[in-house]
Amino acid sequence: MPKVALYNQNGQTVGEIELNDAVFGIEPNKHVLFEAVIMQRASMRQGTHKTKNRAEVSGGGRKPWRQKGTGRARQGSIRAPQWRGGGTVFGPVPRSYSYKLPKKVRRLAIKSALSSKVLENDIVVLDQLSLEAPKTKEMVKILNNLSVDRKALIVTDELNENVYLSARNIPGVKVVAANGINVLDVLNHDKLVITKAAVEKVEEVLA
């Protein structure tokens, strides 16, 4: 089982924590990570694209000229696709791009993402994370104490409002609860800062 240092908010080592091998110690599956990221990004698409077809554009109800005798090509409507201002053929329509991978694959993906952070030594485990009041300066100080100077994902056991409000104005820092942890967030941030209670909660669900 991988062991990592346990820190307090002042950046001091206060012990060690043993992480569950089944969650934080597996060989990361790159293909599953890829599939999970594609799924998440697809779900983020708005899908509100739309063009009008020949039935929806304005006008074109009358035949522009008679069928025969003019010497010109036959036409049925000035809103046919070949006309300027005509309707689009097989154009985009509003749709949802979201889909779901099997539950086992999704779980393997999040375990692979967490294990990759342990392998790269990009995980910081805190004994606890609490603030008396929302204060961005205090959160910056805590991150500096932990030598976290890059994009960081902070994971708490439950969404702490003071922690959330203190971190939301710091560029590159995001706060999520343990039950909201996902592959895209873990991979998109350089450092994973997670509380001991959140580790236990994640292991309880994924182990």
From Swiss-Prot:
> Keyword annotations for this protein?
Ribonucleoprotein, Ribosomal protein, RNA-binding, rRNA-binding
Name the GO terms of the biological process aspect. Answer: translation
Protein source organism: Geobacillus kaustophilus (strain HTA426)
| PANTHER family to which the protein is assigned, alphabetical | 50S RIBOSOMAL PROTEIN L4, LARGE RIBOSOMAL SUBUNIT PROTEIN UL4M
Q: Which GO terms describe its cellular component?
A: ribonucleoprotein complex; ribosome
Q: What is this protein called?
A: Large ribosomal subunit protein uL4
Say yes or no: keyword Acyltransferase present: no
Say what the protein does. Answer: One of the primary rRNA binding proteins, this protein initially binds near the 5'-end of the 23S rRNA. It is important during the early stages of 50S assembly. It makes multiple contacts with different domains of the 23S rRNA in the assembled 50S subunit and ribosome.
Subunit relationships? Part of the 50S ribosomal subunit.
Does the keyword Ribonucleoprotein belong to this entry?
A: yes
**HAMAP family assigned to the protein according to its UniProt record, in alphabetical order:** Ribosomal_uL4_B
Ranges where the record places region Disordered:
44-78
Q: Which NCBIfam families match?
A: rplD_bact
Q: Which cysteine pairs are covalently linked by disulfides here?
A: none
Gene Ontology molecular-function annotations: rRNA binding; structural constituent of ribosome
Q: Which InterPro entries match?
A: Ribosomal_uL4, Ribosomal_uL4-like, Ribosomal_uL4_dom_sf
Q: Which family does it belong to?
A: Belongs to the universal ribosomal protein uL4 family.
